Amino acid sequence: MKRIPSLDGLRAISIAMVMVGHLGKWKHISVGPLDSYGSLGVQVFFVLSGFLITKLLLQEHDRSSTISLGNFYARRAFRIFPAAFVFLAVVAVLFWREMHWTHIAAAVFYVANMDETKPWIFNHLWSLSIEEQFYLVWPFALKKWHRHKTKILIAVFLGTPVFRALLYAVKSHGPIGGSLPVYSDQLAIGCLLAVFAKRLPRIPGYLGAGMAIAAVLLPWYPATSPVRSLFMLFVLRPLLNVCIAGVVLHVIQVPYRALNWAPVAWLGQISYSLYLWQELFCSNANLHYGFVLIVPSIACACLSYYFVERPMLRLREKLARKAQPSGPVLKAASQPA
């Protein structure tokens, strides 16, 4: 799959929102719900992930009338595991006093979203765990029920807010509150976008801008009462998903120069490694250093990207060429959020 213009730019914006969300808790710049933009950035990553993975799987199904789960999981393993396991190894050594083997196991097996006692350095791994669980479920479901994919995705998109609101109503704050079903609508709308992208009309610039503005403003909604919180969970969050999907579709249809500017695209390319390493520096424990923490975060991300991610992607392509000498090689553009 060729690199899609503007998506690296969206990744750059997303990782910037995550870091602003963390650093927004710094006492000298605490303005409004800046920390909510961390969640918004992750939400964009989920939509992008659903879109890209589904697009990749549908292209394979169109070519061969099937989906090779083995090949899919091998590609994901080369893309995701090396950088993540290097990060885990480093922080396990640095913070061994705060670690228990169960925390390491939860991170390695991508169930950190269910680990309520994990140390602060693993707090961000909840979203990567949800994505990995999505990778385990969705390709299998798409292969088995390909003809019913649209019905399945619509049911998930509409059912998730109901499930989320019910959890809030019964005050369930245990491990299930961070589980895949709670966030499935964000992934589902990205999948739906991949299914219908070619058939959807071009989104006018004013509508694309309006959805982008709405996505930025919705986190400011004051969920200050139970009724307001239910309204946010049941209505506003699905609306935010629609706005994000609309923005993704718009920038694919009309590539923006700013999103494809080399420094912005580069930040998007290293966004996975940057997401892994920013937690080490941009946590509550280090907030008194402020925005200077961005520098070591990017430095570690660069080391991870150039010395771990890219070599493993080149190895993946080399092995793919040996396995299928005459077939197309998947590029790193199919990378997850």
Where are these regions (language model features)?
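Aromatic-anchored segments of alpha-helical transmembrane domains
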Residues: 16-24, 92-93, 111-115, 156-167, ...
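Alpha-helical transmembrane segments of multi-pass integral membrane proteins
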Residues: 39, 187, 191-192, 208-312
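Membrane-interface helix-loop-helix regions
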Residues: 67, 74, 81-132, 159-178, ...
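Solvent-exposed interhelical
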Residues: 132-159, 167-168, 194-210
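Membrane-proximal cytoplasmic C-terminal regulatory module of class A 7TM GPCRs
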Residues: 69, 262, 290, 311-337
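Transmembrane alpha-helical segments and their boundary/interface "anchor" motifs
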Residues: 39-42, 46-48, 58-92, 106, ...
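Interfacial loop-to-helix transition and helix-capping segments at the boundaries
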Residues: 5, 30-42, 101, 118-130, ...
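Functionally critical transmembrane alpha-helices in membrane proteins and complexes, commonly lining
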Residues: 3-59, 78-84, 111-115, 128-130, ...
